[in-house]
Regions:
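Juxtamembrane "helix-exit" motif on the non-cytosolic side of transmembrane helices
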Residues: 21-36, 65-66, 91-106, 130-132
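Active-site-proximal alpha/beta segments of enzymes that process anionic O-linked groups
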Residues: 53-125, 178-179, 190-372, 489, ...
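Internal/C-terminal transmembrane anchor helices
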Residues: 136-159
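Histidine-centered active-site microenvironments of extracellular/periplasmic hydrolases
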Residues: 167-171, 428, 432-471, 522-524
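Beta-strand elements within well-structured catalytic alpha/beta cores of enzymes
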Residues: 174-195, 208-209, 233, 296, ...
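Substrate-binding rim/cap in mid-to-C-terminal beta-strand-loop elements of soluble/periplasmic
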Residues: 215, 446, 450-499, 514-516
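Active-site His/acidic residue clusters
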Residues: 314-321, 361-414, 418
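Polar, surface-exposed loop/tail segments
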Residues: 438-443, 484-488, 496-527
């Protein structure tokens, strides 16, 4: 195997690894990026790129050379162009996807990186042409490869990632609310469930939500990150401010002193972008912005939070509902029907049954709180989302799935009835899902046609609209308004509780859900 081939392949791999380091640094502006860590990371990512990209390229070049031998073949310019072109596209995609997850300066530098890699493509073309024309010797070719490796190094050293810490908001009092609050996080709820699946008279409580509640679709921020969306709902801020992005973090102590909160998007997952298996997956850092329930608790309102997704640290309001099946009040005929309906799906039976038991335990805990002195109850239910994800009937012949979903809808309707029946008069009830679920798109279907893809029936990966429903005094029954955003939920609840809206909240009050008389009698108040 020729030395030139080794230089071309491994040099290109090192360039790809260094570009990956730049992208990881850009995605985590809140992490202290000391020069020592950056410099330590350079050889790590360069060698990782040689292994993960350079070695496959070397094998490919060797095979190509065997079938198409040529003495003067020099592949470095074409390979470098390919790396920088992919980097430009990938950086641009991440800049578009994570616009709301990064601070303004960090996002701006990420956009500039996309342009910089485009310029690097032109540099590779020009430099390669000059070497071929005026000095096509081994020394000049090695110098070209060194220059390509140096481009991402120069980029990260001359244009460091702007440091930006997340917004810090402690649980300060907001005042005394005018009424009690029950907010039900119903994961997987969307207009399809409410208007089509729940159209039957068999679901009286879902019918009540549809006919007596005011509703707005919720357009989730992209990309789909479950914890980020639920945290935005509770805090009224976007992930770039509250700091919760993924449901996991990564520690790479050799390079970073803090936990990485976000990895860049790549077509088939980005876990392998961290070098040499030196990283450790850990729970993400907690939200830096206090959720609305914490501010109500600081105002003296007794609070109960059951199962709300996110990273909340040691929040004393959080309760863990016991999922002991013996203590779960699941009516025996419903239990038997669900067990029979799950029999044809052994691969997901245990997972879905655990979710059913867990949700029922959460309902029991929430009902106990509602019947007591607790004035602020938050509960999250996950069974509907899990059942729809793997067993949504999407073809006429999916009769077993259809029967199973009907039972899940019956169970959900009973749980809603139990929760609504435990609320006192004048209680403000909110039902929210910050995202919906949709069947696989054309790309996923194409992957499945060729034997790839996944086995889910519906997914939130495409960021379909969720739903926000309100019940109570001051709500215009049956009203439908334009789509809201996840951060709009918290300020809307503040306003309807007679509390001031915090100025730091990115969302706004969804006034279309409120009656004109309530708007006239309750002027909007804003506090820091």
């Amino acid at each position: 195997m020729k030395l030139r081939m080794w230089v071309d392949a491994l040099g290109t791999g090192a360039t790809a690894g260094l570009v990956a380091e730049v992208l990881v640094l850009r995605m985590n502006p809140e992490v202290t990026q000391a020069m020592r860590g950056v410099l330590v990371g350079l050889p790590l990512w360069a060698s990782w790129g040689m292994l993960m990209a350079g070695v496959p390229l070397l094998i490919g070049l060797a095979i190509f050379e065997r079938f198409r031998p040529r003495e003067d073949r020099w592949s470095a310019p074409a390979l470098s162009m390919m790396v920088f072109l992919i980097a430009a596209v990938l950086t641009g995609v991440n800049a578009k996807l994570y616009a709301l997850l990064l601070s303004g300066p960090a996002h701006r530098v990420l956009v500039q990186d996309s342009v910089a890699w485009g310029v690097a493509v032109l540099v590779a073309v020009a430099a390669g042409s000059l070497v071929r024309r005026f000095g096509n010797s081994r020394g000049w070719q090695v110098a070209f490869s060194i220059m390509m490796v140096a481009l991402p190094v120069v980029r990260i050293l001359t244009v460091p990632t702007p440091q930006r810490q997340h917004l810090e908001v402690t649980a300060q009092p907001l005042g005394e609310p005018e009424r009690r609050l029950l907010i039900i996080g119903l994961e997987g709820l969307d207009t399809k469930v409410l208007l089509v699946d729940a159209a039957s008279a068999s679901y009286p409580n879902l019918t009540r939500l549809r006919e007596q509640g005011a509703r707005a679709p919720i357009t989730p921020h992209r990309p789909y990150l479950r914890w980020a969306l639920w945290t935005s709902t509770a805090t009224g801020t976007y992930p770039g401010r509250h700091g919760v992005k993924d449901h996991r973090g990564w520690d790479l102590p050799l390079v970073f002193s803090e936990t990485l909160r976000l990895l860049p998007w790549t077509p088939e997952g980005s876990r392998m972008i961290l070098p040499w298996g030196l990283s450790k997956q850990v729970p993400p850092p907690p939200a830096t912005v206090a959720p609305l329930w914490a501010r109500l608790d600081a105002s003296g309102v007794s609070t109960c939070v059951v199962g709300w997704p996110g990273s909340w640290g040691d929040d004393p309001s959080l309760q863990t509902a016991s999922s002991d099946e013996v203590g779960t009040a699941l009516e025996w005929t419903m239990r038997a029907s669900l067990e029979a309906a799950l029999e044809p799906f052994p691969e997901r039976r245990s997972q879905i049954w655990s979710a059913i038991v867990q949700d029922q335990a959460r309902v029991e805990a929430a009902v106990d709180a509602l019947k007591g002195p607790v004035g602020n109850v938050w509960i999250n239910l996950e069974t509907l989302s899990l059942a729809r994800r793997y067993h949504e009937p999407i073809r006429p012949r999916d009769t077993r799935e259809r029967r199973f979903l009907e039972l899940i809808m019956e169970l959900l309707d009973e749980q809603l009835g139990t929760l609504l029946g435990a609320t006192a008069d004048q209680t403000l009830v909110a039902v929210v899902s910050p995202f919906g679920l949709t069947p696989p798109g054309s790309f996923e279907r194409l992957k499945r046609f060729f034997g790839g893809g996944e086995s889910w029936h519906t997914s939130a990966e495409g960021s379909p609209d969720g739903l926000f429903i309100l019940l109570g005094n001051g709500i215009d029954p049956g009203r439908r308004v334009q789509p809201a955003r996840p951060p709009d939920v918290a300020p809307t609840l503040c306003y309807l509780l007679g509390l001031p809206v915090a100025q730091y909240m990115d969302g706004s009050v969804v006034v279309g859900l409120v009656t004109p008389s309530f708007l006239e009698e309750h002027p909007l108040r804003v506090v820091d």
